[in-house]
């Protein structure tokens, strides 16, 4: 590889043993973020990158796996899953689409939540559950409105993946 490009960065993640390429994907994502932070001289981002292992460990210690296991029955016997996100969350939805298809052989399709109401929503039906990714406080309101519309108009089962600790309180405040 050293002879292919002018420069070479080893991900240092070891041999990839997962068919979903989880280690290499996460390592390459961190390298891309690190590259952008160094290029822009953004010390805040560099500090956040250094905290990432602790943040991931903390997330896993807070019953995240149990929450995931509780939501899985909703998706167990479906043939299709929709994933919606906006901004950074759209990239997460796209990667989740691949991981779901590779790991479970379930058809999955990711859309931008701001584009979805303008065409793809016509394919929505109550037999296809939707996973929403909410991480951007600037766009959460419009995405929550889309969650509510899809649930009301199509009786679709939904899962919301969010960084918001008190999403129910937040929803109550915006009404």
Predicted regions and their residues:
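A SIS-like phosphosugar-recognition module
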Residues: 1-175
């Amino acid at each position: 590889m050293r002879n292919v490009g002018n420069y070479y960065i080893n991900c240092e993640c070891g041999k990839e043993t997962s068919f979903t390429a989880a280690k290499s994907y996460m390592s390459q994502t961190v390298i891309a973020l690190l590259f952008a932070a160094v290029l822009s001289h953004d010390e805040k981002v560099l500090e956040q990158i250094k905290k990432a292992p602790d943040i991931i460990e903390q997330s896993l210690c807070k019953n995240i796996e149990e929450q995931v296991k509780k939501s899985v029955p909703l998706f167990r016997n479906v043939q299709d899953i929709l994933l919606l996100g906006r901004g950074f969350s759209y990239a997460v939805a796209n990667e989740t689409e691949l991981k779901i298809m590779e790991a479970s052989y379930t058809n999955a399709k990711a859309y931008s939540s701001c584009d979805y109401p303008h065409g793809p929503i016509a394919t929505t039906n109550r037999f296809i559950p939707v996973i929403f990714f909410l991480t951007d406080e600037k766009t959460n309101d419009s995405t929550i409105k889309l969650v509510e519309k899809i649930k009301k108009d199509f009786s679709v089962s939904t899962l919301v993946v969010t960084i918001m600790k008190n999403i129910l309180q937040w929803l109550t405040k915006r009404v």
